[in-house]
C-alpha cells in the first residue's frame, strides 16, 4: 500500500489522535506519527490492522503487549500513554522518540564502532532484564 492509499493518514482516532505519517509497519500493526490533539503532544500511534483485529488471539496478544509494557519501569523502554478501541480499531498511543531508527543507521553505516554496539546492546539487555525480571 502506498502512503497516498493509506486510509488512516489524516484521520482522527478515538477523537483524540490525528494521524500524520506512517512510521513503520509489521505483521500485526502499523505505527504512525500522530498528535494527541488535547495536549498538542507528538505520539507514536500503533494501530492493529483491521484484518488482524477480527482474530481473537491477535487482539489478546495486543492487549497483553499493553499490560506488559505498562508494568515496565526502565529508562530504556518507551512509555505507553493510552490504549483503547475506536470503532473496529484497537490502538496504543505511546511516547514518540526522535532520532534515526537503528535499521536506517545500519543501512547507512553497516559497520558500527564497537563502543556504540556495546552501548546499544547494554541498553537492550537492561530493558529485557527489567521486562523478564
Feature-to-residue mapping (PLM):
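Conserved N-lobe loop of protein kinases adjacent to the ATP-binding glycine-rich P-loop
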Residues: 35-42
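AlphaC helix of the eukaryotic protein kinase fold
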Residues: 49-71
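Activation-segment/catalytic-loop signature of the eukaryotic protein kinase fold
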Residues: 83
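Protein kinase glycine-rich loop
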Residues: 19-26, 31
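Flexible N-lobe loop architecture of eukaryotic-like protein kinase catalytic domains
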Residues: 24, 64, 72-76, 89, ...
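Protein kinase catalytic-loop region centered on the HRD/HxD motif
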Residues: 126-133
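Conserved short submotifs of the Hanks-type protein kinase catalytic core
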Residues: 87-101, 105
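Activation segment signature within eukaryotic-like protein kinase domains
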Residues: 120-121
Amino acid at each position: 500500500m502506498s502512503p497516498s492509499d493509506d486510509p488512516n493518514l489524516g484521520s482522527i482516532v478515538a477523537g483524540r489522535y490525528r494521524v500524520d505519517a506512517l512510521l513503520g509497519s509489521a505483521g500485526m500493526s502499523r505505527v504512525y506519527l500522530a498528535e494527541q490533539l488535547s495536549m498538542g503532544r507528538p505520539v507514536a500511534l500503533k494501530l492493529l490492522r483491521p484484518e488482524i483485529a477480527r482474530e481473537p488471539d491477535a487482539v489478546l496478544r495486543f492487549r497483553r503487549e499493553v499490560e506488559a509494557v505498562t508494568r515496565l519501569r526502565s529508562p530504556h523502554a518507551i512509555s505507553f500513554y493510552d490504549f483503547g478501541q475506536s470503532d473496529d480499531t484497537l490502538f496504543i498511543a505511546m511516547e514518540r522518540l526522535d532520532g534515526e531508527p537503528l535499521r536506517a543507521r545500519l543501512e547507512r553505516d553497516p559497520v558500527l564502532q564497537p563502543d556504540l554496539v556495546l552501548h546499544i546492546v547494554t541498553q537492550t539487555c537492561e530493558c529485557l532484564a527489567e521486562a523478564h525480571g
